[in-house]
Amino acid sequence: MAYTELNIELTDEQRAIKEETHRFSKEVLRPASIELDKLDRPDDVIKSPLFWDTMKKGYDLGYHTVFIPDTWGGLGLEPLEVHLVLEELGWGSADFAIALGVACFPAFFASMVPNEILAEKIIEPFCEDKDASIIGCWGITEPDHGTDTLCPGTPEFRDPNINGQVTARLDGDEWVIEGQKSAWVSNGTIATHSLVYLSIDPSMGMAGGGICIVPLDQPGVRKGKPLDKLGQRALNQGEIFFDGARIPRDYMLVEPESYEALMDITLATANAGMGAVFTGVARAAYEEALNYAKNQRVQGGKYLFEHQAIKHKLFNMFMKIEAARALSRAAVIYNMNNTPPMTEYSIAAKVFCTNTAFEVANDAVQIFGGYGVSREYPVEKFFRDARASLIEDGANDSLMITGAHAL
């Protein structure tokens, strides 16, 4: 059962966008992610023709440019349409929804501070790509820094004793990059370009950072092995090492004077997007459980749904999903339309929606009983994917502390 769209102001075009994305997710993303999830080694995932065929199909439809304006060749979606697309992609596969979303980060941030070189070398080639030959990654976490990098506006962000492990120094007309990004870099070992967050002025603490684009096919760049993890196993993640990598001066998008403001935009964009994606994951788990209870499983001589305890559980799941959609949609729409963003709402959306996805998936497993932990049904994958979401893009407990600073 698909949810009922309560926004009666959706245009026919917006409904068509939603339906087309849902069809792609149902026919391509979900089957592929389930098959790739069964592979034992993460190396096997990125060597699989199925993985690359799925990425290419996503690129061919432009889902790698969801956040990029049409003036640069992106899909040019309105904020509401972005939410519709992200939820449907998440319904199909959190793995691929995140991979396609993160792939655009270098080009997306370049489009916010464009120049002729960035347009020619980064933005336009990425938007024109139809075969996933240009893939971005988000190089923000480090071996000693995770969610603590995502705290703009807090006293800790300006503590000179806390600094990033990746650094940049200017050498003539080039920046020289040194250091290591952690194993949690999404798309890390398959990316061609990285959006790198680094330290330029350590006396300012984390606030003395910069954001740059680093082509990864150059001397001085080395990638680690793909990370083997519990959930979202089709989402490639891995370390990146910089040892004297060089970039043109124009590839440094943000320097310390505007770093904190851009970090705020980063957090608002990523967290709101995660809220939309995991609303989709929650919905996927709920729909599987509802169908199983109403049409498949008989217990005590009647379908599971006829038992009051199951009705109560399913309606509780339904309520949570509707609330998650409302919050994440509001955060996406407001923060894509306004600068500076209200980041606390994006944080609230990320925390609430990922918690909802985990709780709903957990309830779905319980409704399925023994089959809930069997790979015969997809709810166990939704459960594992949702569990990972409580940590990625900022651990929920820590994000709530960051969000509280704005209250």
Language model segments and positions:
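Alpha-helical interface subdomain recognition
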Residues: 1-92, 116-117, 129, 170-175, ...
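Short secondary-structure capping/junction motifs at helix and strand boundaries
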Residues: 94-99, 116-124, 131-137
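N-terminal glycine-rich flavin-associated loop
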Residues: 97-119, 149
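A gly/ser-rich beta-alpha-beta helix-loop segment of oxidoreductase catalytic cores
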Residues: 134-169
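Short Gly/Pro-enriched turn/cap motifs at secondary-structure boundaries
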Residues: 155-159, 184-186, 203, 229-236
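A short core secondary-structure module
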Residues: 178-222
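Flexible, small-/acidic-enriched active-site or ligand-binding loops
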Residues: 217-246
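Long, acidic (Asp/Glu-rich), low-complexity accessory segments flanking structured domains
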Residues: 243-261
